Structures are given as structure tokens and as C-alpha cells.
Curated annotation (Swiss-Prot):
UniProt-annotated location(s): Cytoplasm
Chain segments carrying region Disordered: 1-40
Keywords from the UniProt entry: Cytoplasm, Methyltransferase, rRNA processing, S-adenosyl-L-methionine, Transferase
Record-given protein name: Putative ribosomal RNA large subunit methyltransferase F
Molecular-function GO terms, alphabetical: 23S rRNA (adenine(1618)-N(6))-methyltransferase activity
Family that this chain belongs to: Belongs to the methyltransferase superfamily. METTL16/RlmF family.
GO cellular component: cytoplasm
Principal subcellular localisation of the protein: cytoplasm
EC number: 2.1.1.181
The reaction(s) this protein catalyses: adenosine(1618) in 23S rRNA + S-adenosyl-L-methionine = N(6)-methyladenosine(1618) in 23S rRNA + S-adenosyl-L-homocysteine + H(+)
Gene Ontology biological-process entries: rRNA base methylation
Length: 362
């Protein structure tokens, strides 16, 4: 496990918070310098990732192939002579994920059922590193035993708990409404000794609830994480997948590639089951419900957090949290190449109460 570095302070707003208003901070990532490597160029340079993210720079395909030999047949050179894979090929993407987890996190078994969400690991890891910064800023001497995290919608892939355990030694609970996801995530943990004893799973039996039915009456969590459903309907989700494929095709043609992915062929890497992709009302409705439920567990959770894919949803979420009585709200942006994403974190406890929380954990 890496020794956490002292996080940098995020940007401060010019205006002081008004009385009885939560402290709202927005942090932006800085673009790192260009990396140069010896020998041949390698595709998929990921700029803007967190300094502790293991996926900064280029994919080391020789090392990845060594841990997952099946990946070799999917590695190719693009017109610029850089090694890459066809990111429209679901098998190639799945094998890349397997190799990344084996090489960088020591996860010897990882798999997902066909049609389930196959997440981009570099971006998922960035979320964990940046929420870790939030904790380290308050408690620079943070001990892994002080952190218990809850991942809402853990999915069959179990990515957030995997990164949280292997990088920081935190304990995790993963919840999901889908029994198949719980079953597969449990198999991943059972098959990797370094994950055993650190992650447990709970089935959410009521799809209308998020924290209710998962957080026990006497339980306390340091933080929660979530990758919420993005779309409002199945049709919306299918249209979103098609847009991704169209954009990928255009990018491939621009780079001189001939591969033309189809919707059915790319179901895995752009895919996901119903609960992973959509819910009535889409992302805005889901995170709004999360905000309301979080108030019920204000004294049992130190920091709540969730990704927000649609930038337009940030303002509404902040206003709702302010009305609910959140004492501190952070919007933290993440960059991977040209893609900008963000997560929002909030606490119903003020600075003094959070300090007492950490003291009680010592």
C-alpha cells in the first residue's frame, strides 16, 4: 500500500460563506507536464490524473501482456506507430481491465458477466484518490483502520472497493439492487486473498431506497461513494450508447483505422444493466433522492459523495444540499485527457464536529 502524500489545497473562492451557509468549495485539477518514455510510443496518454494514480502516463503494454497473455492478440499499432487496442472491442477492453488490475493492484481474478458495465479504471481510481485527499486534509495522520466506506451501486465490477482496499487499506461495504452483481462482486473478493476480510456486500431489496435498508442503526461510515445511473430510460441509454459509438467511429476514421463497431458488438464496454445505466428521472432524480436520504444519516456518515456526470446537475444538487442543512460542500473536478468529470462531497457536520469524529476514531 502506498503511503499517502499530503494533499494540495483546492482553489478557494473569493467570497466568504454567509452565516448559516455551508462552505462550498470547488477544486480543479492541474494538467501535469508531458511524459516522455524510451523506445516506442504508446497510445492512450492520460493527462490530468491524480499524482497518486497508477495510470498516469502511458499503458505499459509489454507488462500488461505479461500478466494477461490473452491481451496480446488485441494489441495493435495505430497509424502513428503507437501501441493501443480497439476500444470499441468489448473483449479487448475487458482484457485490458483484467491486466490493469493484475499489474497495478495485484488482483489475480477479475471478471464480469456479459452485458455488465466495464468501467474505465483510470478514471474510477481518480475518484478514490481525490476523496482520499478530502480525508487526508482533515486528518493528515489518517490510519486505514479509521476508514469504513460504503459504495452505493457497487456493481459486478467492484472497482471502487478494489482500489480503496489495495491503495489505502480501507474497509468497505458494497450495496446493489442486482443479485447477480452482488454474486459476481463477492466471487471477485473470495478469489483474491488481499481483498478478503476488507469488503462485504449487501443487497438493496427496495429499489426506491439508497441508504435505507443498508446502513444499520448503530453503524458509522467515514464516507460513501457512488457512480449514479445516468439516463432516464432504456431508450435514452441506448441512444447514449449509440452516440458513443458514433463518436468513436469518427475518431477512428480520423486516425486512419478501419474498425467499425456496432451497437451489439460494443454492448460490454459501453454497456451495463438497467440499474447501472438508468432510472426514472435519470441522474438528477437519483442524486436528489440520495441528498434527501443522506440527511437521515447525518450523524452516521462523515462525508457523503457521488459522481455527477452532467455538469448542469451540480448547481441544483448544491442548492438542495444547502436547504437540507449540509455544513460543508465540495465540488471536485477530475480530468482525463479532454474529458472533464466531477464528484460532489458533503457533510452535515461542521469542522469542529468532524474533528471530534476523527478523535473518537483514534
Amino acid at each position: 500500500m502506498n503511503t499517502p502524500l499530503k494533499p494540495k489545497h483546492g482553489q478557494k473562492t473569493n467570497q466568504k460563506p454567509k452565516a448559516n451557509k455551508p462552505v462550498v468549495k470547488k477544486q480543479q485539477t492541474k494538467q501535469p507536464p508531458t511524459h516522455k518514455v524510451q523506445g516506442e510510443e504508446v497510445a492512450a496518454v492520460k493527462s490530468g490524473l491524480h499524482p497518486r494514480n497508477r495510470h498516469r502516463g502511458q499503458y505499459d503494454f509489454p507488462a500488461l501482456i505479461k500478466v494477461v497473455p490473452e491481451l496480446q492478440s488485441h494489441v495493435m499499432k495505430n497509424p502513428k506507430g503507437q501501441w493501443t487496442i480497439n476500444f470499441a472491442d468489448p473483449i479487448a477492453v475487458k482484457l485490458l481491465n483484467k491486466a490493469l488490475l493484475a499489474l497495478h493492484y495485484g488482483v489475480t481474478y477479475w471478471d464480469i458477466p456479459e452485458g455488465f458495465l466495464c468501467p474505465p479504471i483510470p478514471g474510477r481510481a481518480d475518484y478514490i484518490h481525490r476523496v482520499a485527499d478530502l480525508l487526508l486534509k482533515e486528518n493528515p495522520k489518517l490510519n486505514p483502520s479509521q476508514v469504513t466506506a460504503l459504495d452505493i451501486g457497487v456493481g459486478a465490477n467492484c472497482i471502487y472497493p478494489i482500489v480503496g482496499v489495495t491503495e489505502y487499506g480501507w474497509s468497505w461495504v458494497g450495496s446493489d439492487v442486482d443479485p447477480v452483481s452482488i454474486q459476481q462482486a463477492s466471487l471477485i473478493v473470495q478469489s483474491n486473498s488481499k481483498l478478503q476480510g476488507h469488503i462485504e456486500f449487501r443487497l438493496q431489496k427496495n429499489s426506491q431506497h439508497i441508504f435505507n435498508g443498508i446502513i444499520g442503526a448503530n453503524e458509522r461510515y467515514t464516507l460513501t461513494t457512488c457512480n449514479p445511473p445516468f439516463h432516464a430510460s432504456l431508450a435514452d441509454a441506448q441512444q447514449g450508447t449509440q452516440r458513443k459509438l458514433t463518436n468513436l467511429q469518427a475518431n477512428q476514421r480520423k486516425k486512419g483505422r478501419l474498425a467499425t463497431p456496432t451497437l451489439s458488438h460494443s454492448r460490454l464496454n459501453f454497456g451495463g444493466q438497467k440499474a447501472e445505466l438508468w432510472c426514472p428521472g435519470g441522474e438528477a432524480a437519483f442524486i436528489g433522492k440520495m441528498a434527501v436520504e443522506s440527511q437521515q444519516f447525518a450523524q452516521q456518515v462523515l462525508w457523503f459523495s457521488t459522481l455527477i456526470s452532467k455538469g448542469d446537475n451540480v448547481r441544483g444538487m448544491k442548492k438542495q444540499l444547502e436547504k437540507l442543512g449540509a455544513q460543508s460542500i465540495h465540488v471536485i473536478e477530475m480530468a482525463q485527457g479532454q474529458k472533464i468529470s466531477r464528484f460532489i462531497a458533503w457533510s452535515f457536520q461542521n469542522a469542529e464536529q468532524r474533528k471530534l469524529w476523527w478523535q473518537a476514531k483514534c
